Amino acid sequence: MSLLHQARFFTTVNHLRDLPATAVPEVAFAGRSNAGKSTAINVLCNQKRLAFSSKTPGRTQHINYFSVMPAKALDPLGFLVDLPGYGYAQVPGEAKSHWEHLLGDYIQTRSQLAGLVIMMDARRPFTDLDCQMVEWFLPTGKPIHVLLTKADKLTNNDASRALMSARKVLAGYQAQIEGEVSLTVQLFSSLKRRGIEEAQRTVAGWLCLPEAMPPSPDAEPAKKTPSPDAQRGE
């Protein structure tokens, strides 16, 4: 059984000053308000209501921490961090501004953050806000893993095309930065339970959990492609 199945609620944070003073690794989950983020977290942890999925998109405006630890352990081995969903226009302006700053500051400055999982709807990935999230996080040099959620809504051919397209987008980001950063992507469906083990392996590896296994072939890293200038020999 995955140690992720033993995740439990730890705390809710509304200001950076309230972040837990711990040294263990954290894996954060981000995504648009309707990308199925909370549902995916629940499925990965094999729990129904670990992460609260509001019927009102954009309602969750805090950072929620879930500890990962064996049943009899005294201290967490790591944390899953559920970030506020972004991109919902009907959130009041002041509240929206607050949690956008909270989210941005957290992913850019939190030293304990080991990696970022970004949920994107497989039917329309890499929206402007999704790209902004990637661009916010890239300078940290830490890995990004994209879950193309709701893959069950696509035919097999369309799902394969969506995956190939996403890999090309990530390869473009890889070409823009110095050094190698792990940028991976996979198909995921909470309803059909597709891609769960692959995602669990990635998260467990980032948290350095004992169960960590080699990545699945589906989570193929983006390959660095030459920039247009390089291709022209300039």
UniProtKB/Swiss-Prot annotation:
InterPro entries: G_ENGB_dom, GTP-bd, GTP-bd_ribosome_bio_YsxC, P-loop_NTPase
Necessary cofactors: Mg(2+)
Region (Disordered): 210-234
Residue positions binding Mg(2+): S38, T60
Sorted UniProt keywords: Cell cycle, Cell division, GTP-binding, Magnesium, Metal-binding, Nucleotide-binding, Septation
Domain EngB-type G: 23-209
PROSITE patterns per the UniProt record, alphabetical: G_ENGB
GO cellular component: cytosol
Classification via CDD domains: YihA_EngB
Coiled coil regions in record: none
Domain of life (superkingdom): Bacteria
Family: Belongs to the TRAFAC class TrmE-Era-EngA-EngB-Septin-like GTPase superfamily. EngB GTPase family.
Function statement: Necessary for normal cell division and for the maintenance of normal septation.
HAMAP family associated with the record: GTPase_EngB
Name of this chain's protein: Probable GTP-binding protein EngB
Gene of this entry: engB
